[in-house]
Amino acid sequence: GLPRFVPATNYAASFGFQWNIHARTQLDSHSGLPISHDRLWAAIGGKADLTGQRVLEAGSGAGRFTEVLAASGADVTTFDYSSAVDANAANQAPSPRLHLFQGDIFNIPLAEASFDKVICLGVLQHTPDPEAAFRSLAKYVKPGGQLVVDAYTRNFAALLQWKYVLRPITRRMRKEPLYRLIEVVTPPLVPAAKFLRR
């Protein structure tokens, strides 16, 4: 199995639950669209030849960016705090250049200043302390290397999204009943949301 450096149940357990059920949803190889490919290269600042470069991906989820990085020729080390790392391992072709583990962004069991690129997309805002997570990642970038991160836009309009209104309630629910509830309410809500966006 994969090396694990964190408890099986942790603050990111709901992400593991989600990505193990919908393991291929965001993979370009599954959708046939270059969504993850384009987002990754835009974040890096343009497509680059990563052959031989050491890349650390933090918060890999089910592997949407891992798939792109693995195809780039880089030596990729990737981890997630949740059990989503199991979905990622299942989604990737075995390669001597791909290394996966379950670990903590605040306590990464790797040598500092040893990666050409450290990449963390769509993750920092989900940690208990985004600023500390950012500082932790920066320690693993080689001198002259690149730290690639992003975070959600923080503004008043974003706070009015239903997910933020409902989060205080859903946070207290067990993940299995919450998932079943979502399966029931989503089919009628999707057409209603599309209608309201016109």
Identify the role of each PLM range.
Residues L2-A111, K117:
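Conserved N-terminal segment of class I S-adenosyl-L-methionine
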Residues K117-P128:
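A short SAM/SAH-binding and catalytic strip from SAM-dependent methyltransferases
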Residues L40, V190-R198:
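Glycine-rich phosphate/pyrophosphate-binding loop
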Residues D80, Q102, G122, A151-T153:
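Glycine-rich, histidine-containing beta strand-loop boundary motifs that form or position
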Residues H126-F134, V149:
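Repeat-solenoid scaffold signature
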Residues Q146-P191:
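Conserved class I S-adenosyl-L-methionine
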Residues E131-P143:
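A short glycine-rich, Lys/Arg-flanked "PGG" loop and its adjoining helix->strand segment in the class I
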Residues N107, Q125, R154:
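Active-site micro-motifs of SAM-dependent methyltransferase domains
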